[in-house]
């Protein structure tokens, strides 16, 4: 992609997503996410009726009488976008590739963030963290994010959501709102070991931060068409195989693998209480995103 082509695509996404964030998501974003974060303010002596869960045991031990931690609502929110840049994003059989939809969704969220005078940052990840853009405010910062969303090429092609979430936990000491944007292909082992759908980094991140998952996938990720002999390449491992798609058992096995992944995701959502939405590249992502803001 030439510099001129990149600028044209950035401008196109800016026009589309900035308008969406300003006209559709601004109010919903503010009411749903603004003020969720709580920042430590001070300690004071315990008073009858205070929540005992707020007791600061270290100070209490030193002072020989109970003290509690006092928190105040954070007026400024930090939003982190965790964007999957693994090989499987470079796939699309419908109107556009998954990476294009991911870029538009991330841009819409980024513009919604700065419309509310909040900071937004990005973590690009494959099977490791590929790039970190620290959270900042301002339109120029969002345009920089969009350029990276469109042009960044990772060093690796696999997927490891744990690496991204561990990085988030270490990088963001204070509570933030985070969106995990991925197709989640390769995020879990297949077949899934019983009871292993939720990993420690997912649990820790979902407790520390306001974490939501946005799954973006292509129709053909879930179902294989009956088109006869087809050469298939795994975009994350590079392995190529021939598949006779006219055989029903082949198509069924493909669909079963997809269902196994979805079951793992559902287990993760259920055990962590994580907000989530799933969308195909040929669906209206605006309607899907609105589900996260309600």
Regions found by a protein language model. Name each.
Residues 57, 84-86, 122, 168, ...:
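DG-centered beta-turn motif at the end of beta-strands
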């Amino acid at each position: 992609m030439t510099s001129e082509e990149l600028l044209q695509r950035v401008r196109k996404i800016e026009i589309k997503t900035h308008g969406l964030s300003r006209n559709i998501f601004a109010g919903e974003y503010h009411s749903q996410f603004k003020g969720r974060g709580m920042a430590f303010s001070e300690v004071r002596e315990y008073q009858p009726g205070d929540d005992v869960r707020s007791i600061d045991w270290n100070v209490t031990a030193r002072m020989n009488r109970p003290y509690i931690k006092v928190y105040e609502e954070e007026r400024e929110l930090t939003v982190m976008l965790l964007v999957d840049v693994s090989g499987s994003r470079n796939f699309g059989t419908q109107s556009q590739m998954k990476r294009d939809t991911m870029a538009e969704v991330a841009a819409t969220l980024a513009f919604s963030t700065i419309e509310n005078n909040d900071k937004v940052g990005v973590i690009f990840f494959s099977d490791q963290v590929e790039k970190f853009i620290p959270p900042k405010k301002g339109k120029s910062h969002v345009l920089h994010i969009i350029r990276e969303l469109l042009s960044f090429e990772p060093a690796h092609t696999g997927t490891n959501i744990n690496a991204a979430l561990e990085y988030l936990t270490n990088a963001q000491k204070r509570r933030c709102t985070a969106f995990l944007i991925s197709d989640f292909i390769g995020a879990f082992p297949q077949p899934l070991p019983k009871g292993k759908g939720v990993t420690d980094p997912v649990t820790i991140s979902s407790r520390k931060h306001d974490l939501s998952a946005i799954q973006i996938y292509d129709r053909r990720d879930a179902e294989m068409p009956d088109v006869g002999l087809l050469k298939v390449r795994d975009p994350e491992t590079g392995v190529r195989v021939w598949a006779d798609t006219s055989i029903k058992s082949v198509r069924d096995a493909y669909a079963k693998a997809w269902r196994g992944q979805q079951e793992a995701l559902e287990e993760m959502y259920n055990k962590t209480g994580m907000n989530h939405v799933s969308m195909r590249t040929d669906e209206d992502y605006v309607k899907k995103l609105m589900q996260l803001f309600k």
